Amino acid sequence: MRATAALRVELAADGRNVVRELRSQPPITLIPRRGVASAAGGPAVVHLVGSATSPMGGDRVDLRVHVGAGAALRLSGTAATVALPGQRTGHSRATVRIEVEAGGTVEYLPEATVVSGRADHRADMRVELAEHARARCREVLVLGRYGERPGVLTTSTHVVRAGTPLLRQRLDIGEQRLAASAGYLAGARVLAAETVVWDHDPAAPAGGQWWSLAPLSGGGALATSVAADAVTAQRGLAEALGHHPDAEALTRELW
């Protein structure tokens, strides 16, 4: 399967955040939320819906997002994604590219990705921010379904602001000896992480029971939580974000 979806949001003259381009292609279906939030000048809210079984071996799926100057977008998932083996040889790949112009804001909050046994999946996220742009990008990985060891997973995250790299991170899953190491995942099945580039940066790192909030040297912060299940991991992530100086803005809900 080959698929490309695209989303563009701009700030209208009346102060509303307007979806100017919305192009879906299975397995990615983009559904905008209409009504009160947009009319009141809140962010444009778009839901990310899986409309076909994917990713499977050999699939190539791309999502491209552009947020104009001063505009705000919240792109949120509705259900978990399951990476599966396929009849074709070779790995599957999902690529997310996000561009945010000056003064723009993006919140990319997909649901979890479950890496099933025998899957071989690559996930790449690249975020390019202009000066004074804001972003929060979440990733939740569930390593195997119940009672199942995960297949192979490689994720990479690249965040750049005004040409300066803020985060370049890669994670490789599939080596059982590493999975049990305290310096790796310590046997945890779920990893939740969120990269935050907002109005303020944490003055110092914070941490608790299997969660942490670490300021990045070039600006922004990385919140991380590991746990035996997704609910606990996301609670840990919420606790980490609660120690961010912009916690109130980062923990609000839009329904």
UniProtKB/Swiss-Prot annotation:
Disulfide bonds: none annotated. Keywords: Chaperone, Cytoplasm, Nickel insertion. Its main location: cytoplasm. GO terms for molecular function: nickel cation binding. GO terms for cellular component: cytoplasm. It is found in: Cytoplasm. It comes from the Bacteria. InterPro entries: UreD. It holds the Pfam family UreD. Belongs to the UreD family. UreD, UreF and UreG form a complex that acts as a GTP-hydrolysis-dependent molecular chaperone, activating the urease apoprotein by helping to assemble the nickel containing metallocenter of UreC. The UreE protein probably delivers the nickel. PANTHER family: UREASE ACCESSORY PROTEIN D. Required for maturation of urease via the functional incorporation of the urease nickel metallocenter. This is Urease accessory protein UreD 1. It comes from Saccharopolyspora erythraea (strain ATCC 11635 / DSM 40517 / JCM 4748 / NBRC 13426 / NCIMB 8594 / NRRL 2338).
